[in-house]
């Protein structure tokens, strides 16, 4: 099958060929730390071999659970936050039509997927409860600890809604818990109540977990082919098995990013030209930001959805500070296409476009914008996708994961932890009056003048 390709021709005005050769020793060192598990955080690097070394029996249970959900539910509510949310959301959006939840049942591959537990908004939860109404639904709650605030709140709400609708015993059969194999509040409740459970592997961090049960159950329930997803990742694992930058495009992406960073390009914009890829950017931002942003180092990950954001961010990208570069994820073959309709007269000025498809307009717009941005001093990298399908997605997931793993080690940091997130949690728990935070509560409330 066709693979994704990485294109560096639009950084040639910014990066000389010899700079990649000079980066090779640093990439080789990073590769050794990754593959030999000698780098910081190596205990969380099982994702490297995950496409070939995963629990096949559990994988079959996931497929069976997805079929069960499709047989007894119209809706699956997926409860999780961060890595327990973004990977599944990204994949479900990527692999299904834009308005999948609005399609009639016979026009969808699987059930409607809605996400909860990813914010503290009461309005969001109320609105989702109203959307569900009297439709049959199931819940997939995803949390390693079972005590993360946002998912725990949402789980209470939807668990009680299930119990009210189906009764306590029948509700238990509609709850699927993805959690720690041995410990934690959710694990203990799942065992006690008899929920079907799936395991979050100890050696895979949240932002790398989309190819584990964390992502696989929601993706399968949506009707996507998760075997194709894993096959794509498996082929990428084989393709990116060498450290040589002339043979490993994931590492070449990591090297290009690091070279640009060293030249002062400290912000990366991930660009897409398809609305179904908006959450690809959100997943990527967590993957890159949590992995690299440590010790006052790292590339700041941002994103833009083109052509929409050209009408808001286009001016800044063209003429603002020259500290950013773009990585464009471009789909070479759209899932569907549309001819521009003929219309008598030329009031809208579009007659010159008649006879071509709307995707051709999208492609030419992408090419033109790239040329303009490069001319304006913005280095441009490109990741080309041959198709918008499960195989390609699995391949691309592994591409970005390998790139950031290597990139993190080139910065001399641990790419697999996220110690900085504890600061906001401490402040939030203290202000909410959580037991054990009494001293911090006094301090933070005093600072707020309470």
UniProtKB/Swiss-Prot annotation:
What is catalyzed by this enzyme? alpha-D-glucose 6-phosphate = beta-D-fructose 6-phosphate
What is the protein's known function? Catalyzes the reversible isomerization of glucose-6-phosphate to fructose-6-phosphate.
Keyword flag Isomerase: yes
Q: Where in the cell is it found?
A: Cytoplasm
This one is known as Glucose-6-phosphate isomerase
* UniProt keyword annotation of Cytoplasm present: yes
Q: Its Enzyme Commission number?
A: 5.3.1.9
Q: Tell me, what's a Pfam family for it? A: PGI
Family per UniProt? Belongs to the GPI family.
Catalytic-site annotation from UniProt: 290, 311, 425
Q: Which GO terms describe its molecular function?
A: carbohydrate derivative binding; glucose-6-phosphate isomerase activity; monosaccharide binding
């Amino acid at each position: 099958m066709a693979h994704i390709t990485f294109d560096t021709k639009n950084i040639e005005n910014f990066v000389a060929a010899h700079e990649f050769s000079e980066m090779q020793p640093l990439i080789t060192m990073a590769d050794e730390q990754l593959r030999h598990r000698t780098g910081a955080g190596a205990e969380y690097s099982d994702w490297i071999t995950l496409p070939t070394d995963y629990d096949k029996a559990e994988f079959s249970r996931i497929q069976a659970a997805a079929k069960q959900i499709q047989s007894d539910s119209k809706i699956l509510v997926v409860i999780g936050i961060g890595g327990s949310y973004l990977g599944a959301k990204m994949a479900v959006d990527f692999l299904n039509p834009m308005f999948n939840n609005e399609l009639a049942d016979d026009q969808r591959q699987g059930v409607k997927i809605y996400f909860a537990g990813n914010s503290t908004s009461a309005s969001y939860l109320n609105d989702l409860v109203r959307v569900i109404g009297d439709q049959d639904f199931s819940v997939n709650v995803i949390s390693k600890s079972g005590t993360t605030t946002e998912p725990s709140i949402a789980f209470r709400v939807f668990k009680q809604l299930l119990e009210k609708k189906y009764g306590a015993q029948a509700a238990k059969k509609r709850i699927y818990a993805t959690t720690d194999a041995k410990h934690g509040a959710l694990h203990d409740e799942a065992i006690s109540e008899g929920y079907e459970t799936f395991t979050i592997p100890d050696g895979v961090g949240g932002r790398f977990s989309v190819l584990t049960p964390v992502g696989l159950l929601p993706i399968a329930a949506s009707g996507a082919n998760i075997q194709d997803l894993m096959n794509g990742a498996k082929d990428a694992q084989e393709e990116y098995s060498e450290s040589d930058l002339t043979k490993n495009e994931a590492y070449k992406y990591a090297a290009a990013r690091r070279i640009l960073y060293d030249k002062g390009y400290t912000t990366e914009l991930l660009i897409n030209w398809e609305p179904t890829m908006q959450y690809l950017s959100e997943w990527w931002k967590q993957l890159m930001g949590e992995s690299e942003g440590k010790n006052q180092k790292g590339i700041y990950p941002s994103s833009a959805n083109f052509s929409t954001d050209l009408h808001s961010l286009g001016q800044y990208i063209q003429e603002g500070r020259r500290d950013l570069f773009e990585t464009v994820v471009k789909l070479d073959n759209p899932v569907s296409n549309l001819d521009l309709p003929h219309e008598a007269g030329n009031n809208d000025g579009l007659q010159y476009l008649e006879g071509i498809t709307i995707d051709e307009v999208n492609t030419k717009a992408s090419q033109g914008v790239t040329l303009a941005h490069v001319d304006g001093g913005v280095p441009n990298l490109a990741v080309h996708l041959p198709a918008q399908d499960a195989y390609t997605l699995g391949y691309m997931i592994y591409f970005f994961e390998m790139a950031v793993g290597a990139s993190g080690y080139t910065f001399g940091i641990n790419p697999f932890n996220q110690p900085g997130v504890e600061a906001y949690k401490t402040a939030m728990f203290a202000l909410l009056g959580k037991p054990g935070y009494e001293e911090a509560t006094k301090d933070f409330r005093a600072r707020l003048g309470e």
